Swiss-Prot record:
The family this protein is said to belong to: Belongs to the TelA family.
PANTHER family: TELA-LIKE PROTEIN SAOUHSC_01408, TELLURITE RESISTANCE PROTEIN
Top-rank taxon, per record: Bacteria
UniProt cross-references to InterPro entries, sorted A to Z: Toxic_anion-R_TelA
Protein name: Uncharacterized protein YceH
Organism from which the protein derives: Bacillus subtilis (strain 168)
C-alpha cells in the first residue's frame, strides 16, 4: 500500500535529492494533471512563447545560486579568528604558580603578603573581565551562525520548491516534444507531395521542435544547478553546526567555569593569607601570654581548619584552561575546513553556471 512518504513528489526538507529520486519524480510527474496542462498549453508556432517557457523558476534558481555564492564569499571567519587569538593571549597569562604557597611565607607575611595577594587579585580580576568580553563576543558569533543556518534552511526549502517547478516544465516540454515527434512523419509525407502549404507547416513544426528542444535543454541545465545547490546548502549548514557545537561545549560552558574558578581561587587565597596572619599573631601572643597558650593554640588550629583547602582545586582550573585551548585549536581546524569547503562549493556552483551560459551560447 502506498503511503504519503512513499510519494516521490513529497520531499522532506531533510531529504537530499539523489539521481534515482529525480528519475522517480520525473516519472510520476508525467501522470500529474498540472504537467499535462502545461504540455497542452505549449504553442509550437509561437517562437517568443517558447523562448519564455519556464522562465520564472529558471530565474529563481539563478537567484538562489547567486545568493549561495554571495553567502560563501561574505561569510567571514576573520572575526572569530581574531577572538580566538585574543583569548589565546589571555590564556597565556594564566600561571598556576601564582596560587602556590611561597617559601618562607610566615617570615614574609607581615612585610609583603598583603601587597602580593592584592597584585594577584588585580591580575586575575582583570583577566576575568577580559575573558567575559571574549565570552560575549563568541556568544554573538554563535548566535549569528545559528541565524545563518535558519536562513540556509529557508533557502534549501525554496530551492527544492523551484526545483520541482523546473521539473514540471522540463517533463511537460519533453511530453510535448514526444507528441510533436510522433506527428512529424505525417507532415513530412504531406510535404513530399509538393504541397506548399504542407511544406510551410512542416517547417513550422521543425522550427518549433528545435526551439522547444533548446528551451528544455536550458531548463534541464537550470534543474541541474538546483540539484547541485541543495547539497552545497547542507554542506554550509553542517559546517556551521559543527562550529556551534564546539562553541557550546568549549566556550559557552567552560569559560564561565574557568572565570569563576579563578575568582574563587584568588578569594580563597586572600582569605587564607588573613587566617595565616592571624595564626602568626596568635603565636607571638602566646609567647607573652603563657597562661593562655593552650586555648589560643587550639583556636589557631581551628582557624587553620576553617581557612582550609579551597573549594576549587587549582588542577580543576588548569583542566578548564586546557579544555579551552583544545577547543580553540579544534575550532580553528573546523573553520579552516569550512573555508575550504565554501571555496570548493563556490567554484563548483560558479562552474555549473558557466557551463549553462556556454551551453546556451552554443545552441
Amino acid at each position: 500500500m502506498t503511503t504519503e512518504n512513499q510519494n516521490p513528489l513529497v520531499l522532506d526538507k531533510n531529504e537530499e535529492i539523489s539521481q534515482q529520486k529525480a528519475d522517480d519524480i520525473r516519472l510520476q510527474l508525467r501522470q500529474e494533471p498540472e504537467v499535462k496542462r502545461l504540455a497542452q498549453q505549449i504553442d509550437v508556432k509561437n517562437q517568443m512563447e517558447l523562448l519564455e517557457y519556464g522562465k520564472e523558476p529558471a530565474v529563481e534558481i539563478s537567484k538562489f545560486s547567486d545568493r549561495i555564492l554571495g553567502m560563501m564569499k561574505t561569510t567571514s571567519v576573520t572575526d572569530s579568528g581574531t577572538m580566538l587569538t585574543q583569548l589565546g593571549k589571555i590564556m597565556d597569562r594564566f600561571d598556576k604558580n601564582d596560587f602556590d604557597e611561597p617559601k618562607g611565607l610566615m617570615a614574609k607575611i607581615f612585610k609583603r603578603g598583603g601587597s602580593m595577594i592584592e597584585k594577584i587579585f588585580k591580575k586575575y580580576q582583570t583577566l576575568g573581565g577580559e575573558i567575559e568580553k571574549i565570552h560575549v563576543e563568541i556568544s554573538k558569533y554563535k548566535d549569528e551562525m545559528t541565524k545563518t543556518n535558519y536562513t540556509l534552511d529557508e533557502m534549501y526549502e525554496n530551492n527544492i520548491k523551484y526545483y520541482m517547478e523546473l521539473e514540471k516544465y522540463v517533463v511537460a516540454g519533453q511530453m510535448k516534444l514526444e507528441e510533436m515527434q510522433s506527428i512529424l512523419p505525417s507532415y513530412e509525407e504531406k510535404a513530399a507531395s509538393g504541397n506548399q502549404l504542407a511544406q510551410m507547416q512542416l517547417d513550422t513544426l521543425r522550427n518549433g521542435i528545435q526551439a522547444l528542444e533548446e528551451r528544455v535543454y536550458d531548463l534541464d541545465m537550470a534543474r541541474m544547478v538546483a540539484l547541485q545547490t541543495a547539497p552545497q546548502i547542507r554542506l554550509l549548514q553542517r559546517g556551521n553546526a559543527k562550529l556551534i557545537g564546539k562553541i557550546n561545549s568549549a566556550f559557552i560552558i567552560t569559560i564561565p567555569i574557568f572565570k569563576n574558578g579563578i575568582i574563587q581561587a584568588v578569594t580563597v587565597k586572600r582569605q587564607k593569607l588573613v587566617a595565616d596572619s592571624m595564626s602568626e599573631l596568635d603565636r607571638r601572643t602566646n609567647e607573652m601570654l603563657k597562661r593562655n597558650a593552650e586555648n589560643i593554640s587550639s583556636q589557631s588550629v581551628e582557624i587553620a581548619r576553617m581557612a582550609g583547602r579551597p573549594s576549587i582545586d587549582i588542577e580543576t582550573i588548569e583542566s578548564s584552561w586546557n579544555t579551552i585551548v583544545s577547543g580553540m585549536q579544534e575550532t580553528k581546524q573546523i573553520e579552516e575546513e569550512n573555508k575550504r569547503l565554501r571555496e570548493d562549493g563556490a567554484r563548483r556552483i560558479a562552474q555549473l553556471q558557466d557551463n549553462i551560459k556556454k551551453a546556451a551560447l552554443q545552441q
